[in-house]
């Protein structure tokens, strides 16, 4: 199934999309095409089981976060990667503008900023592959996922140990570029860090 770019839609159209897709999708468990999800999904109480496949990051702690600058911050319960994957349930409406915080086990001391997964690097289109070496060359990136209304979605991310500002750190990114929402943040050697929840622009 090909991945299509997602752009925010008018509220009424999105509401209709949420209802129609809910009736059509049933209990879909395959990897889903991300669809722009919105707060209107709250009205019908959709939930999504989000599975992240994370090789070579056993013991990494994953937290899903969502903040659009208007609604309260959403934070999932932190979950640990076991057997190369982790599954977290969250409201579908909060997948729009979702960011993923990664705390790798090799960071044994507290750091000033958290590592976030990059869904799209500048110059890459939805569906484009990007490896470690190319990711390390990038200077701008988005850590805001476009979201979904599917009941179950599986995404693949990669996490590698790197040096960041002379200290042990991590780079986390989607090896296949995913649907995203702004902003594009400045990154150093492909590493997206923040000292707070990423603010994602759903309404641009």
For the regions a protein language model found, what residue spans apply to each?
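Short Pro-Gly-centered beta-turn/loop motif in secreted/extracellular proteins
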Residues: 83-129
């Amino acid at each position: 199934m090909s991945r299509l770019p997602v752009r925010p839609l008018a509220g009424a159209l999105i509401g209709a999309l949420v209802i129609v897709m809910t009736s059509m999708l049933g209990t879909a468990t395959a990897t889903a095409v991300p669809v722009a999800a919105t707060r209107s999904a709250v009205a019908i109480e959709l939930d999504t089981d989000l599975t992240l496949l994370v090789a070579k990051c056993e013991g990494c702690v994953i937290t899903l976060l969502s903040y659009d600058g208007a609604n309260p911050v959403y934070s999932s319960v932190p979950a640990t990667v076991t057997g190369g994957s982790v599954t977290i349930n969250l409201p579908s409406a909060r997948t729009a503008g979702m960011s993923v915080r990664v705390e790798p086990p090799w960071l044994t001391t507290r750091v000033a900023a958290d590592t976030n997964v990059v869904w799209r690097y500048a110059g890459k289109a939805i569906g484009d592959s990007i490896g470690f070496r190319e990711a390390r060359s990038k200077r701008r990136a988005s850590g805001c996922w476009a979201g979904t209304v599917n009941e179950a979605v599986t995404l693949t991310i990669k996490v590698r140990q790197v040096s960041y500002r002379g200290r042990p750190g991590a780079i986390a990114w989607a090896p296949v570029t995913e649907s995203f929402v702004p902003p594009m943040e400045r990154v150093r050697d492909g590493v997206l860090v923040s000292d707070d929840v990423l603010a994602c622009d759903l309404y641009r």
